[in-house]
Amino acid sequence: MIKEVILMTNVEERIEQIIQVLREQVVQDTAVPRNIRRAAEQAIEALMNKEKEPAVRAADAIAILEEISEDPNMPLHTRTIIWEVLGALEQIK
């Protein structure tokens, strides 16, 4: 029982870290096109939806971010961040 609570905390902490990265390095970066920032905001909203299980929230965010990950207008540094976030989200079960 305690182990499950610790695991949930770790998952929630990871989700919070991912949200922070998306906010600070994508949403607030004015060099990133608006449509990409908007998609990052949608992914953040999906991750913050506490009504769903963490794995479902992660899957929702993955779907949103994968859709924009190949956008030709995305700056290279942003693409790298998105790929790192996708890798972190894929580890959430």
UniProtKB/Swiss-Prot annotation:
SUPFAM superfamilies: Ta0600-like. Disulfide bonds: none annotated. It comes from the Archaea. InterPro entries: Ta0600-like_sf (IPR023130), UPF0147 (IPR005354). HAMAP family: UPF0147. Belongs to the UPF0147 family. This is UPF0147 protein PH1921.2. It comes from Pyrococcus horikoshii (strain ATCC 700860 / DSM 12428 / JCM 9974 / NBRC 100139 / OT-3). The lineage of its organism: Archaea, Methanobacteriati, Methanobacteriota, Thermococci, Thermococcales.
